[in-house]
Each structure stands twice: as structure tokens, then as C-alpha cells.
């Protein structure tokens, strides 16, 4: 086992104080899973002083402690254990954690090729498509993000789109152990701001777009954009890999990032970019896209519907090309990609009613989603949507405006209310609803979906937005089983 002192030196972690030394075999910040020989990290918490957990961690065999306060450090020293101090007020604690986590766990991201995808919309679909295409082309690949972790060895859900540093490094080890050679992962703005992904050595970073979201966390669009830029401007400094920035040049922020990146850049778009796309045909559950890159030409027949998925396919193709895969092969792999669960997912039926379940939960995502549906020329669009509780309140009326602008009828309901009053959330939404918008309030989501489908006639499309693949609803702090797709099927059964 390596010595703690050696791990500190190799990691480049800057610490305020160090006392003692010991062999280290792992790292953990959870007393439920800490093991013999681990470095136990006392992560700052609003709910308790995590230094109080040191005795429990030591009782389970922890060999050393990383503290974030002088008192915590001194307490660890007094218990006779090697300890380190990185005061959280210096702003270096998060840096020390990701550096030590990556080093102690053997820098797993160096052993695979990693594609990181960031942007307001399209992260999940783009990352999913990259993984699906790689698998189709014979490359064992993994996915990590909103849909959980999927490796050649299996899959499961995750609590965060991009987990915290220690958990993330352990997941990377899991990816390596599964036999995967590639990983496509979503990189959220929260994770970039909180330095969660700094210990990941990316080969490729894909930028999809930037529109309003998460302003409750970031405070402003400038701060939000700055967080996204870290994937392209700061994280490449932490790796010896040849990093390629893949940027949507049709998006103003993508063009701005291009002007700042020092390394290799590959741009894509429909109007601008090295890789160009053109939508030839878009249907409810399939699309045709023409692609060109230099002298190369290819046509993609994808098993996805909706105009916005044309952009996602283009993003994924660009990411694959950045990995060194030629355009024709990338297209062949993408043609075999399975549809993404809960992303423009059609609920098929014999009633002649189109039903789409989608995760769209921002004004821009809803605009693109409903624009895609409108492009299919339905008789009417009936939209069911709500807004998540304990999240950005400023976007609620904007989401209403986006929905009303492109829907013939609207059913406003609950999403994941969490600890907020569902009626108060809907009241915020209704501030964006003009008198001309044909909208009704049905707070219970089950009843709302049933109401929307009962209103539908042959040739109409019912769009159920906001939760997508989720098979639960969060009420308070409890996850209650609920699946929009199943609710839609049950509502269809009740039609005459």
C-alpha cells in the first residue's frame, strides 16, 4: 500500500497542516462504507460537524483523516491517527479532495477514453448516443449521468448527474473493472462549479448549448456560463491527454468558448462548424440526417424522433469524430443506437393519438420539444407540465410562456414538488399564462395525464413533459412510485 505522504506529493494537493504518516489503501467520506486502511474525508456539511464521525470511521479501520477545520484536525491528532488539514475557508479543500481521491484510487480515468458532455439541454441524449454508437462499433463503453451508470457489467441509478469526487472516482474504477475502454458522461454545471469532475481526465469535451436554467444555484447567466466553460478552459490543465473541445458553433456561447480555448477544437452546427448537418426527414420516432466533414459525406437514419434530436445526433457524431472515428463509422454506430428512455419517447397505441413523454424542464427545452412536435403537423398539441420544487423559481412563468406559445391546450400540474407546496408552485407557473392560453390546473399528476389524454382525439399529440424516464415523484423528501409512460398507457385503456 502506498504511504499517505507519497499520495499527497503525487497528487499535488496543497494542505495547511500534516501530522503523521500511514499506508493508505482507499478513500471514503461515508462511515457506512469506510474500510480498513482508508483515508477518511470529513466533508463540510450544513447539517452537522462531520468531524464528529471520526471515532466511528477509526473504529471501522480508517487509517488517516482529512479535516476541514483546525478543531477537527486537532481532534484527529489527539486520537493518535495521521491527519491532514485543508481549511474550507481557504477554498482549497475541494481541490485537495479530488486530487487525493484520483491519486489514491489509481487515476482510473487515465485507463479509459472519456467523453464529457455539458450544456443546458441535450447532455443525456448526446452522452447516451455516444455510448450506444461505441458499443455498436465494438468498443466496450459505459455511460454515466442522469440515467445512472451503465457499463458492460450492468446498470443502476445514481443520486446525482455527476457524483461528488470520491464517489465519482470509485465509479470510474467500476467502469475500468467492467472492461469498458470508453466512457461517455454528463458533466453538470453544479459539478463543474463544485469541482466534482476536476479529477477526471477527459479526452473530449462536448458543449451542446446554453440557455436559462439553474439560476437559483449560479445566480446569473454569466456565472452559469463560467461554470460550463471550466470543462474546456480549466479541466484540460489537469491531464496529460490530448484534449479536444467539441463546440456547437451555432450557439453563441459555443462560439465564445472557441475563442478562449488554447488547445484543439472541433466545431459543429447546421449553419456554422467543421461538421455540418442537415435534417432531411423528422418523424415521431425516426429521423434522417445528412452529415458532412471536409470531403466526407454520410447519411444517418436514426431511431429517434423530434427535430431537437437532429441536433443531439449531430453533437454525438462530432464527439465520436473527436475520438478519432471516421464520419461514416460514426454514422453507422449511431444508426444502431437505441432511443433514450424518457427523451421524446413515444407511447404507441391504436387510438391514433400521438403521446410523447419527455424530460424537458427548462423554457428552451420545452420550446424545442414543442417545436419538434409542431413540425410533425398534428391536429392539436395538448401539453401536460409542471415545475420542480426547491429549484429555480424564476423559470416557472417562462416555462408557462414556452408551453402556451406552442400548445392548443395545456394542463398545468405537479412535477416533483419536493418540500414546496404544489399549489404555490403552480401559482408561480400561472403568472406566465396569458388569458388567451387554454390552460387548466390539475394538481395531481395522475389525474392531469388522464385529463389530457381524455381530451385528445385522433390526430392530436399529447406531450407529457418534465419527468421523462423517472419512475417516481418526489413529494417532501420521499420518492413515490410514478411513471408517466405507465400512466399514459392506463389512461389510454380507459378511452372508449
Indicate residue ranges for each PLM-predicted region.
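Phosphate-binding loop of NTP-binding sites
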Residues: 8, 92-249, 255-261, 376-377
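Active-site beta-alpha connecting loops in nucleotide-dependent enzymes
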Residues: 45-48, 339-342, 364-435, 445, ...
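Short glycine-rich anion-binding loops that position phosphate/pyrophosphate groups of nucleotides
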Residues: 45-47, 189-190, 212-213, 251-252, ...
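Glycine/aspartate-rich loop-and-adjacent alpha/beta segment that forms the canonical ThDP
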Residues: 461-494
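N-terminal leader/targeting and accessory segments in enzymes
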Residues: 1-99, 103, 276, 301, ...
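C-terminal helical cap/extension that packs against the catalytic core
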Residues: 3-6, 10, 65, 69-73, ...
Amino acid at each position: 500500500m502506498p504511504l499517505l505522504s507519497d499520495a499527497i506529493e503525487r497528487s499535488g494537493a496543497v494542505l495547511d497542516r500534516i501530522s503523521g504518516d500511514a499506508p493508505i489503501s482507499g478513500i471514503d467520506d461515508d462511515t457506512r462504507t469506510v474500510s480498513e486502511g482508508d483515508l477518511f474525508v470529513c466533508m463540510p456539511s450544513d447539517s452537522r460537524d462531520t468531524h464528529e464521525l471520526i471515532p466511528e470511521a477509526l473504529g471501522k479501520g480508517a487509517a488517516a483523516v482529512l479535516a476541514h477545520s483546525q478543531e477537527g484536525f486537532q481532534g484527529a491528532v489527539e486520537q493518535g491517527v495521521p491527519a491532514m488539514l485543508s481549511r474550507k475557508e481557504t477554498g482549497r479543500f475541494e481541490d485537495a479532495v479530488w486530487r487525493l481521491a484520483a491519486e489514491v484510487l489509481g487515476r482510473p480515468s487515465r485507463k479509459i477514453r472519456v467523453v464529457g458532455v455539458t450544456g443546458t439541454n441535450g447532455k443525456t441524449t448526446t452522452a447516451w448516443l455516444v455510448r450506444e454508437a461505441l458499443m455498436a462499433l465494438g468498443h466496450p463503453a459505459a455511460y454515466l449521468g442522469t440515467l445512472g451508470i451503465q457499463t458492460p457489467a450492468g446498470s443502476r441509478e445514481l443520486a446525482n448527474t455527476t457524483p461528488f469526487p470520491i464517489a465519482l472516482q470509485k465509479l470510474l474504477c467500476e467502469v475500468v473493472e467492467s472492461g469498458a475502454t470508453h466512457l461517455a458522461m454528463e458533466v453538470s454545471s453544479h459539478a463543474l462549479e463544485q469541482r466534482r469532475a476536476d479529477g477526471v481526465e477527459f479526452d473530449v469535451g462536448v458543449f451542446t448549448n446554453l440557455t436559462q436554467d439553474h439560476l437559483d444555484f449560479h445566480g446569473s447567466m454569466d456565472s452559469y456560463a463560467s461554470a460550463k466553460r471550466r470543462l474546456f478552459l480549466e479541466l484540460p490543465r489537469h491531464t496529460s491527454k490530448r484534449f479536444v473541445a467539441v463546440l456547437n458553433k451555432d450557439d453563441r456561447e459555443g462560439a465564445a468558448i472557441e475563442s478562449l480555448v488554447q488547445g484543439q477544437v472541433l466545431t459543429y452546427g447546421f449553419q456554422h462548424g467543421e461538421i455540418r448537418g442537415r435534417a432531411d426527414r423528422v418523424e415521431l420516432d425516426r429521423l434522417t440526417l445528412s452529415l458532412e466533414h471536409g470531403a466526407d459525406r454520410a447519411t444517418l437514419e436514426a431511431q429517434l424522433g423530434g427535430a431537437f434530436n437532429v441536433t443531439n445526433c449531430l453533437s454525438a457524431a462530432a464527439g465520436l469524430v473527436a475520438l478519432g472515428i471516421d464520419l461514416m463509422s460514426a454514422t453507422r454506430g449511431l444508426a444502431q443506437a437505441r432511443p433514450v428512455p424518457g427523451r421524446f419517447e413515444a407511447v404507441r397505441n391504436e387510438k391514433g393519438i400521438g403521446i410523447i413523454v419527455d424530460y424537458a424542464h427548462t423554457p428552451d427545452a420545452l420550446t424545442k420539444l414543442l417545436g419538434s412536435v409542431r413540425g410533425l403537423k398534428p391536429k392539436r398539441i395538448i401539453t401536460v407540465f409542471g415545475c420542480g420544487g426547491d429549484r429555480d423559481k424564476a423559470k416557472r412563468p417562462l416555462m408557462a410562456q414556452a408551453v402556451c406559445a406552442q400548445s392548443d391546450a395545456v394542463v398545468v400540474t405537479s412535477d416533483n414538488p419536493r418540500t414546496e407546496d404544489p399549489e404555490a408552485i403552480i401559482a408561480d407557473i400561472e403568472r406566465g399564462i396569458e388569458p388567451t392560453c387554454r390552460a387548466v390546473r390539475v394538481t395531481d399528476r395522475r389525474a392531469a395525464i388522464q385529463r389530457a389524454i381524455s381530451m385528445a382525439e385522433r390526430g392530436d399529440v399529447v406531450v407529457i413533459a418534465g419527468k421523462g424516464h423517472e419512475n417516481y415523484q418526489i413529494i417532501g423528501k420521499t420518492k413515490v412510485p410514478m411513471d408517466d409512460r405507465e400512466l399514459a398507457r392506463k389512461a389510454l385503456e380507459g378511452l372508449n
